[in-house]
Amino acid sequence: MTVIRLTKMGRKKRPFYRIVVTDSRKRRDGSWIESIGYYNPMVEPEVVKFDAERLAYWKSVGAKLSDRVAAITSK
């Protein structure tokens, strides 16, 4: 199953996340199909950038959103 979830980037105690499309069987930081955006919770206000067209495309072909991705993309 294809999922859209966060993969952790950044350094120790300074997390930064990519919003990626991947197979659900892959590890969190494993290989991914496409990167569609990023999320930075460490700055004020939080920065969320993603390609809405690509998100809509992947949802239309059956990709599931993780809970956290669903929450941050609905803002």
Curated annotation (Swiss-Prot):
Q: Which UniProt keywords apply?
A: Ribonucleoprotein, Ribosomal protein
Cite a single Pfam family from the UniProt record: Ribosomal_S16
Membership in a protein family: Belongs to the bacterial ribosomal protein bS16 family.
One MF term in GO for this entry? Answer: structural constituent of ribosome
Q: What is this protein called?
A: Small ribosomal subunit protein bS16
Keyword Kinase set for record = no
Record's InterPro entries? Ribosomal_bS16 (IPR000307), Ribosomal_bS16_dom_sf (IPR023803)
Q: GO:BP terms for this protein?
A: translation
What gene, per UniProt, encodes this protein?
rpsP
Q: What species does this protein belong to?
A: Campylobacter lari (strain RM2100 / D67 / ATCC BAA-1060)
Keyword Ribonucleoprotein included in the entry's annotation:
yes
Q: Name one GO cellular component term.
A: cytoplasm
